[in-house]
Amino acid sequence: MSAPTPLAEASQIPTIPALSPLTAKQSKGNFFSSNPISSFVVDTYKQLHSHRQSLELVNPGTVENLNKEVSRDVFLSQYFFTGLRADLNKAFSMNPAFQTSHTFSIGSQALPKYAFSALFANDNLFAQGNIDNDLSVSGRLNYGWDKKNISKVNLQISDGQPTMCQLEQDYQASDFSVNVKTLNPSFSEKGEFTGVAVASFLQSVTPQLALGLETLYSRTDGSAPGDAGVSYLTRYVSKKQDWIFSGQLQANGALIASLWRKVAQNVEAGIETTLQAGMVPITDPLMGTPIGIQPTVEGSTTIGAKYEYRQSVYRGTLDSNGKVACFLERKVLPTLSVLFCGEIDHFKNDTKIGCGLQFETAGNQELLMLQQGLDADGNPLQALPQL
């Protein structure tokens, strides 16, 4: 055992391996910059950060938009309606954007007979509110603290239904994204959480490939234990960005895979396959009592295409359940569009049809001239802006 070093010779003690001696700049800094251990941690982080930047990674987007090219852009589930519909939209300004909308519908089980909505948006704030003839109120508010942090609030109040409140926080870094949200959160006197909490993380590992996971915790009753699950996510974008693949392995055993393809300049195609694993109880044919369980796998596939032209947009889908659907949006005038959608279920011998009109009006002279394809001086525009 070596003898202890006298205090007078403390300066002769060698430095710890892998720790560089303090520089003159570090010795004049604060505790974290002058401390050798914290300095080593900071140097290691800088090296890792420099290596990540050399990989040329990009932001992978959010988990919510993992397969938006297929589910939102190509497929028509976001646009389909039944019955007759008329939309009257009026834009008052472009920056900041302020717009109101009146929606009338007849013969639809999903849409209310009348709904009014207002929208306001600028560089940092987005606010939208809706109210219908049944006095059901809904609204959402997005506020960007900076380019990376966005806070979101969704609220829905309906007669005869429980109130829904969702709080959400988005963080978009250069090569990853984090999202945390909670639905109807509440805490008891004992500090027990009830509601739904979801946290997701998506990280780019190469310029084309991103991997992530999503965790969910749900507890509706304070006396019962909560449920938790983890879903695994992946997204791959080709170098030319002409096709995108995304996959999800959800906590309930569902496997979802989708593929988006840019066929031509104005043609897009997408396919999505869902496999659901489950358990079916087996009962005794004579007694009717359960005697076991049997694993089952159910699946469905949907194929869709989108044709976008200068004055019209066409979407069509075909799935393995025998449903064929289409949606057509035709701009007859700069301020008038005609909507048509239809669906045929061959297995159930059922059909659905929807027709609608969409009017765009301007709240001032400048916007009116823009809708007519003219600038402030009355000269034709090269491209008609989208209001």
From Swiss-Prot:
Keywords: Ion transport, Membrane, Mitochondrion, Mitochondrion outer membrane, Porin, Protein transport, Transmembrane, Transmembrane beta strand, Transport. The keyword Transmembrane applies. It comes from the Eukaryota. GO terms for cellular component: cytosol; mitochondrial intermembrane space; mitochondrial outer membrane; mitochondrial outer membrane translocase complex; mitochondrion; pore complex. This is Mitochondrial import receptor subunit TOM40. It is found in: Mitochondrion outer membrane. GO terms for biological process: monoatomic ion transport; protein import into mitochondrial matrix; protein insertion into mitochondrial outer membrane. Channel-forming protein essential for import of protein precursors into mitochondria. It is a multi-pass membrane protein. Belongs to the Tom40 family. One of its GO terms (molecular function) is protein transmembrane transporter activity. The gene is TOM40. It comes from Saccharomyces cerevisiae (strain ATCC 204508 / S288c) (Baker's yeast). The keyword Lyase does not apply.
